[in-house]
């Protein structure tokens, strides 16, 4: 449904500290590495040279801001409620302190709600503007959005994971399942959600 499409779009625009492989194993993404310091402290070394879609470089300040923003959000804080605080310990290191030992921390830090956002851009423009004009560090940047109709994404050449092979992604809202089937059969669509 709508949620799966929103998650698909978000995972193209944004990146998280961790990602989960097809086997369900957490792997570093925007984090270069991590280590558990004790039962309630996890250190993350942040990947250097990562760019947001506006060309600015991601910093540990953006990471702390993004996690603090998620904690403060009544909509998504359940994903990060285990976090006591985020401490910047170096130019590219942070320590996440948890309220108590929390085993699924790495998985939770791969959930799209924990995406790293550009602090200065969000603070300057506000949450409402950011929701309509998002920029992240993901493989695609949003170039056009027609609410209720379509979203057009374009490959981000400076993506830290390498330039995506597909140049453009267009996601269209097609309310009728039968129309989605026809779009697949005629080749108008490459992927369709909720066909049955």
Question: Predicted regions: what is each one?
Answer:
Residues 1-38, 68, 135:
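N-terminal lobe/hinge region of extracytoplasmic solute-binding protein
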Residues 18, 22, 39, 51, ...:
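Sec-exported extracytoplasmic/periplasmic mature domains
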Residues 21, 25, 111-164, 168:
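Gly/Pro-rich hinge or "lid" segments in bacterial periplasmic/extracellular proteins
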Residues 32-74, 89, 95, 183:
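Aromatic- and charge-enriched surface segment that lines or borders ligand/interaction sites
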Residues 156-196:
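Ligand-site clamp/hinge motif
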């Amino acid at each position: 449904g709508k949620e799966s499409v929103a998650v698909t779009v978000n995972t193209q625009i944004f990146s998280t500290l961790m990602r989960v492989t097809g086997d369900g194993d957490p792997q570093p993404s925007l984090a270069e590495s991590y280590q558990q310091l004790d039962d309630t402290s996890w250190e993350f070394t942040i990947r250097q040279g990562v760019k947001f879609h506006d060309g600015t470089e991601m910093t540990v300040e953006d990471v702390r801001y993004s996690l603090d923003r998620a904690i403060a959000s009544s909509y998504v804080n359940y994903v990060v409620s285990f976090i006591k605080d985020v401490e910047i310990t170096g130019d590219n290191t942070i320590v996440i302190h948890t309220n108590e030992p929390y085993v699924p921390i790495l998985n939770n830090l791969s959930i799209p709600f924990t995406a790293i956002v550009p602090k200065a851009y969000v603070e300057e423009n506000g949450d409402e503007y950011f929701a309509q004009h998002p920029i992240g560090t993901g493989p695609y940047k949003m170039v056009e959005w027609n609410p209720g109709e379509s979203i057009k994404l374009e490959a981000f050449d400076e993506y830290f994971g390498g330039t995506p092979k597909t140049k453009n992604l267009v996601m269209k809202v097609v309310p009728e399942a039968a129309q989605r089937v026809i779009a697949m059969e005629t080749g108008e669509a490459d992927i369709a959600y909720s066909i049955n």
